[in-house]
Amino acid sequence: MRVVLGFIKACHPLPTIAVSLVISAFGWSLGWTGLPLLAVFITILVGQLSVGWSNDAHDANLDARIGRITKPTVAQEVSARALWIAAFTALLAAIVLSLAIAGWLGGSFHIFAILMAWLYNIRLSRTALSWLPYALAFGVMPAFLSFGLNDEPPTLWSVAVFAIIGVSAHLANAIPDAETDAAAGVGGLVIYLGTRRSVILCWLLLALGSGILVVVSFATNLWLALLVSVTFVLAEVLGSRLRHPKAMFYALIAVVVIDVAALVIVTAIN
């Protein structure tokens, strides 16, 4: 049981489930239903498991060196070797599943996304290019689902919004740990920019993503356009003025969640 819990913790369960649900919800809005939609969810989940396990396996030595006792490899709940084996097994399974449910063209985009996430884990997570795999991996998700469903290309605006959401989520997730990461010698775009400039960049990206959603939804659903606009302004004001140390983080995440929901709704309406 201890080993099973170690594998669960090492897969980064919350982000893994969140990403799988978000992309599956977008797939539903495009027209995926029933068993094919379930297959999409399982495929994405398996891919995310490979990403989470490879991340903890690769960082095992660093986590041990800086004493991250909450990490399962440091707590000796599971070994780095076992995580590598599980990660490669999940990667191979995700490749097969991607091609099976979305064909060679659609499936190749999901495989590319998974490989970008692995590239982040192994090489780019501690560099100023840490944002790039997020932009590319999230940006190709509409192509995976659209080509896989009916061999049609995705809308350009959905590609742009997905890429923006990916980079914004990366920044918002890294900002709260910027000081501890810097002290541990861990790099990344947030470390290179500093917390203040990273927050500004994240808000600018979310403003762009929200703006695209407002423009796209304005013609078909005025209330949705207003909701996205008001939520963005309210979150920015509260995040800037509240004194809670994580107020800005929660505000940024709130906008990301609203943008994701709006993306699904706009796609379903259109």
Feature roles, as predicted:
Residues 29-36, 134-182, 196-200, 205-208:
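Functional transmembrane core segments of multi-pass inner-membrane proteins
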Residues 19-26, 132-149, 191-195, 250-267:
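Small-residue-rich segments of transmembrane alpha-helices in multi-pass membrane proteins
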Residues 2-9, 72-154, 235-242:
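Intramembrane alpha-helical segments
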Residues 17-58, 95, 107-118, 152-172:
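Membrane-embedded alpha-helical segments that form the functional core of polytopic membrane enzymes
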Residues 43-74, 165-189, 195:
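Acidic (Asp/Glu-rich) catalytic motifs at the cytosolic membrane interface
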Residues 2-5, 197, 215, 221-270:
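Extended hydrophobic alpha-helices typical of membrane-associated regions
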Residues 60-106, 110, 186-219:
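Multi-pass membrane catalytic core of lipid/isoprenoid biosynthesis enzymes
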Residues 34-41, 103-110, 127-132, 152-158, ...:
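Short, aromatic-rich membrane-interface segments at the entry and exit
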